[in-house]
């Protein structure tokens, strides 16, 4: 069985919003364990507002949570995104709670690797994701975007 992985998906620093992403078979159970107001029946792609809590039930931050059901996700696995305030402390505490609930810290590029291994991206598209992330001007961004969308220009 595949691991459930997690990482902070937004750059660290001060910001209005930060995202912790979880991908794998235990994503939904992790959502239910750290999202205090989580309903019994979670509707895929529905946005839920509530609070992230640690394993003692202490509130970490306000957040929205979104569950996306496999195979219709970037990675091809179940995915949950927790969107909270963009505080380094808040995001790290949410990630710590996610890991304590059964995920492991994702390796760099592992979400894209899983998308490739699950047939959601081909090799050219996986390389384009890296190029998009690293682009520093409009032209490389445009080329990588075209490559990701199937055009080799």
Model-found features: residue ranges?
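A glycine-rich (often HGG/GG-containing) alpha/beta subdomain
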Residues: 1-142, 146-150
């Amino acid at each position: 069985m595949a691991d459930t992985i997690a990482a902070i998906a937004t750059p660290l620093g001060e910001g209005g919003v930060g995202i912790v992403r979880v991908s794998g078979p235990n994503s939904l159970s992790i959502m239910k364990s750290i999202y205090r107001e989580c309903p019994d029946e979670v509707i895929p792609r529905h946005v839920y507002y509530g609070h992230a809590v640690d394993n003692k039930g202490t509130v970490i931050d306000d957040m929205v949570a979104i569950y996306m059901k496999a195979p219709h996700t970037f990675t091809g696995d179940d995915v949950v995104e927790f969107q909270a305030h963009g505080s380094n402390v808040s995001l790290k505490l949410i990630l710590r709670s996610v890991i304590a609930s059964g995920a492991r810290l994702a390796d760099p590029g592992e979400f894209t690797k899983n998308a490739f291994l699950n047939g959601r991206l081909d090799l050219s598209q996986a390389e384009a994701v890296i190029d998009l992330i690293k682009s520093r001007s409009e032209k490389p961004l445009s080329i990588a975007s075209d490559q990701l969308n199937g055009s080799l220009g």
